């Protein structure tokens, strides 16, 4: 098929006397016999992207072929309009770019070739912790501590802002990247050099998907994949299956958007939508605001989908107007969407791989927990759910009734008591309905004489300054303050594990009595050990229920039938939707968005006063424990090939649902960990360890932190929690890091075995970089989460899955086996079968087939070059 120059599909679109070029997908579809209105809206956006960036008729025909079977095995190149980053993943990405510049210089090439070709926005939101809480000074104190801890990282980011084109930093204390993206950065229709096209992006955070609620196609990728995208490399992908979710009816009773997303997460996780697009349609859309939709799209990683997409409609325009977008931009969005058949039409006949239906009126008030976001629990069943789960917590006190006195306090705590109640996360703080609802419930609680229990650590950390502005304007902020939900920061805080310490007396009581206490938060993840090392149980809930559980102080009562106070029930203080809507109508306007985002890139005086060095290449400080030149390019220019893996050892065997939190924790650094020993050796006191997430710019810390989660369970070490394994060279139980270094010294390759959903959770590429630096060559699992699989490939690690009924369990592996992986040397292709030879200590040898989970020829190239970063440098050197 001949190449068709895509200029034949350019047409003019005039909006308010301004002329734009657009790429006409109606004409392109007609030319290849593609019935455009049968294509899901999300795929129409992809079709335009392919048409505009590569007018190859074969690529366009892929969409026509997709309609026949509603799936595809053909890859396309996706070129996002921009990249979004947060600081935990953004710092290592900029470290990589700085290292790439050094690598280019090393091989005699122009280092300035390493420069973003598309807009990149980095929002600093992951570094603030809840050190101070429950008072009016908490925000200032936490911001001060954040700047003090992270000054070196922030200086590095400011260097990056002057060193790289198209790179902007939103300073700390401003907001959460996804809420800033939703309220300010996103355009829905982008325009550049006179051409208009759908806004799209990839982001280095898995919850980048939130923006699909605003009809902007985007998803999370690892930092290394984002780096290649900003340097002009396409995101290669197979056109995904698209699951249509038909929403009908309207939320009723006490149900909120949070309850809806927890319900959707439960349904879709069970449906197994990993690697698929989800698209929402139906008459229920008219009853969901953009804020509601954004809540649903935000949790796409939790239900496993690549994205949860909502098409453009009147709600999109209303949201753009209320958030202060220019009227000319809003008109462009409307006219472009209608012209290109991207405007939602309930009479369209779009076809999906599969269709599910959900009646919104059936959604019930819910929480999710205690360990996974897909484990939804009806509000009236939370107490029984926790009590049923209690026996399954390792090393826990199982007595549900006994209370233990807290030293120097006049109260006692026990299993199931709530010690953290956090209104946190862009998932919910971007939604005025649940935020106003929480404030109204606080008001009514105080009017009924209720108060927060003294053992509960409370906090409010919204995703943008607009939230505190409308709470203040409505007069409701004082009620949240009175209950201890004072502003602690504009950032991710508790949702990502930056919950800060508990009262020392409470911590001692928990540890001494092995209590399973709980956190209740309005976040999106609750994996064990994530929120706080001492809260083994964590439940996700709406901000309204977060306040309710702070009042009750325990999970062990049914809030639907048991009074919170003296004859006061939850239903007595629950705000009606009418009350909430009235406050929203009187308190939220476009001027507050315009005002709060006018200086979004300026930051505080402390930020502006940061002194930095300038220059094209970064001046590395060898003594730094935050920013270090990584070793990824030490062998740049060497020959590239893929070889069979011989005589590998098993470093660890893991069960199901091993998350990227388990693999590369983001939270506190344990005082007895290999990372702690490294920091102490470099004269860093425990008080100044900061977190793993903050030290992702230093590979020495991060490789030591790999598999160092205190709750991870390696099946090679029965009954032991934490990052330990058996060193087969000595037979001794050691840390995973020390064992890996011993194997590396003996030039022994390593593999990991695991169960289902390996690598679920955050997009963090350190969950692939760390294993790569430990010497892991392959991960063999029952299934992989989408982003993590890509990250493994991007770091040159082979993702392999079992065939048939084989699993780590029925193979009866104990970790002493020697592994050969055969079939990698010659003409390797996506989805190849690989022979796995397992040699047991008894000299018994068995051979099984594995499937190579590499999807595209580009991914084969990444493996051949050792990593996507080396591939990019090699591609640019010419």
UniProtKB/Swiss-Prot annotation:
Cofactor notes: Binds 1 [4Fe-4S] cluster per subunit.
An MF annotation (GO) of this entry: 4 iron, 4 sulfur cluster binding
Record's keyword annotation contains Lyase: yes
UniProt-annotated binding residues for [4Fe-4S] cluster: 426, 492, 495
Enzyme class: lyase
Cofactor: [4Fe-4S] cluster
InterPro entries (UniProt xref): AcnA_IRP_Swivel, Acnase/IPM_dHydase_lsu_aba_1/3, Acoase/IPM_deHydtase_lsu_aba, Aconitase/3IPM_dehydase_swvl, Aconitase/IRP2, Aconitase_4Fe-4S_BS, Aconitase_4Fe-4S_dom, AconitaseA/IPMdHydase_ssu_swvl
Keyword Metal-binding included in the entry's annotation: yes
Gene Ontology biological-process annotations: propionate metabolic process, methylcitrate cycle; tricarboxylic acid cycle
Catalyzed reaction equations: citrate = D-threo-isocitrate; (2S,3R)-3-hydroxybutane-1,2,3-tricarboxylate = 2-methyl-cis-aconitate + H2O
PROSITE patterns named in the record: ACONITASE_1, ACONITASE_2
Subunit structure: Monomer.
Identification of the protein by name: Aconitate hydratase A
